[in-house]
Structure formats: structure tokens, C-alpha cells
């Protein structure tokens, strides 16, 4: 996985001076105990840092400004141990630019029935202190995540951890650079979009580079580096027999290794974490990048085919949310319309990430009927099984829309010996008919990011952080209600 900045999350506890210094001391001790205990749990991908118990408007505003200024702080987690009058929070929340999570918990799990007294009641007031704080968030329209439950509950911790990954993806988004090799596939609509608007909305820098720039990097790769990478291929993957001996198949694999090394060097030199290619712009290259793209995706790079820079950026961000696991560029390719067993076969010309593989990938070389170049090497495998999501980001002109479909990936019932690409089979929720109808009504693209590891909740959280629309298609979706949701959303987003 591509390395990330050493991010951290700030834990800030709200209180007030009404209860005396002894109570505030206990609030601080409890807060530190919670943070220390949470940091011992390996579920958390980044450390929590206890900042302070804040009791005045000045303290609150100061910590929010400090969070904004910190490159390490990826988000702020707030909790009201006692009652904390929420007018004190207005100045700070007006300034805060980092993702905000409101943890509605309390230090003790159970009521101490035999010993509870008013001292206990005055100290442990989260039940109404967090409601006061929640009101000001609603009154101000603050984008925030609310997680409810005892801090020792594994489900609460899991939700916190996933939100952390999403907040880090949002932080990465603000500095994300996409390299476009060539332009979009000609005459295609959905892969187009407002790159200036995307930089304003998400922080993405999206720029194009001539194929000649990449070709020079490929030519500069040493044969020693190519041979070392070929040795790595032989350790990680099955290889067709012809690819293990000198000849045209071996040379095709060698060329993909050269492309991988050159492409990676270009991306590293420019600090790019996502990129696009297109089969219509390959002048000077021997092959369309296939195996090379698959392996770079497995390292955490975002990718989009046919110049699809929005999906490339989305794949990168979902890779961050997923910690690099089980996430790939994808395309709805063809349908299986057997009554009662409708499924979608997802694939692409070459570029499906091996992190979603159920079987050991196999390097194969086959002709590619488009692009007019030599036969490219690629990894071929069947995808895994389990609950997953497909996500698409589209540009509607006046706003971006994120569309999420929950799906269930299934094991293929039949072999596909003549299909020379990586593939995965899934059943969309609530059904192929209703999901496809809703997807088309929403304008969802044919390119998506498929993930076993990212959840709908994470994608909704990201949309909230980024200030964009998000619609979800799942087992509860009815097309008639979904159509109304799209109409209501149109009014809401045009009015913002």
C-alpha cells in the first residue's frame, strides 16, 4: 500500500466550570483513560491524541484552529462528558475545517444502582450534554458524523475506525494528483467532467501528459530491473508455460514489466497517486498497459480506463478507505438474465485489481482487438465472494453525485476457459432489474469502483465531508421512491 502521512485524530472533551475543579479533573482522567484504552485496540488504523477538556468559548475556538493548522490531524472527535453549553461551541465550529465526529458515549457502561447519587449524576451527563451539543450542530448545519454507544463496544470501535479511514481518504483527497496519459475515449460522455470544479470540490489536481513523456520513462528502465521484476512475477503468479521460456509470450510479459517500472517511476516523480490510460492514445508504446496497471492498483494507486479521471480518483480514495484491501476499478460488462438467478459479470479489457481475486492470478497473453498494438500480458482470475459495493462518481454540471449499489459477489457456476480477462460475478441488490433501473435513472457510469472492504456508510461519510450528493441502491430500494429521492435531491442541491 502506498505510504500515508502519519495522521492522527484529536479527542476533545466538552465540559464547563459549573461543577468545580474536582469534577473537571475526573473528566480529564476519564477522557485520558478512554483514549489510552482505544489506542491499545489494533482495530484503529491511526492514533488518537487527547487534546484537552475544553470549558470556554476561547478554548474551543483555539483547539479548532490548531486542528485546522495541523497537517497530521485528519479529524476531530468530540464528546460531552458533562453538560457543555453549546453556545460556547459556535465560534470553534464556525472555524473548524477538519472532519468532525460526535461520539455519544459515557465513561461508565452501567448505572451503579446501589451507589448512584447526585455527584455521579452531575459528572456523567452525556445523555443530555451530547443532546445540547447535537442541537448546535443541527442549528449551524455542521457536517458531522454521530456514533452512539459505549466506547468499549466492538461495534462502536469498528465504526470509529472506518470513519477514521474515510477521514484520511478525505485528507488525501485534498492533495490528490491524477496523471492522464492521453485524453478521454472519443465521444464518451460520462468520463468527461469539470476538472476545475473537481479541484474546488475535492482538491484533485487533474492534468494531462503526452504519451511520449511516459514512453521515455519506459525506455529508461534497465534490463536488470526488468529481470528482477520478472522473478517477482514468477513468485507471485502462475504463468502460462510459454511465458516461462524465451519467445513472443515471454517478451510480451517482459514488456509489461518494463511498462510497470516506467509508469511507476513517472508517478513517483510527479507525486501522482492516480492515473488514466486510453487505448486510443498509445503512440510509441508497444502494448496497452494491462498487467502493469493491475499491479499498480494492488499497490494502492487509483486507475480509470479510457481517460476516466473521476473513477481513477475514486479508486484511489476507496483504496485508502479499504487499507488497500479488496478494491478495484470495474465495469458492468455483461448480464446473465436467467429468471430468478440474474447476475452481472464485471470485468474490463485488462485492468482489474488482483486484490479482489479468489484464485491465484495467472499471467496470460492474448490479442486485444482494439488499440492496434501488440498482444498485452494481463492477470487472469476469478473474483471472490461476499458482500460488496459498486460506486460511481458523476458530474451533473452543477454538482457531483456519488451513486452506491450494494451487491453480493458470487462464485461462478461455470468455468469460463475462453475468457482472457479477470472477472467477478455479482447479484446487485435489490435485484438486477430494480438496481439497473435505479442506476440508470441516477446517471450512474459504466465504470465503477468495486470493493469488498469499503462500506456504504463510509461512502456516505465521504460524501458528507466533501459536500456532495450521495444516493444508495440496496435491498430497501424501490424504484418509485428512488425517483422521488432524485427529484427531491435536485431541489435541495440547486438551492444550496
Swiss-Prot record:
Keywords: Arabinose catabolism, Carbohydrate metabolism, Isomerase, Manganese, Metal-binding. One of its GO terms (molecular function) is manganese ion binding. SUPFAM superfamilies: FucI/AraA C-terminal domain-like (SSF50443), FucI/AraA N-terminal and middle domains (SSF53743). Mn(2+) binds at residues 306, 331, 348, 447. Binds 1 Mn(2+) ion per subunit. Homotetramer. This is L-arabinose isomerase. It comes from Geobacillus stearothermophilus (Bacillus stearothermophilus). The lineage of its organism: Bacteria, Bacillati, Bacillota, Bacilli, Bacillales.
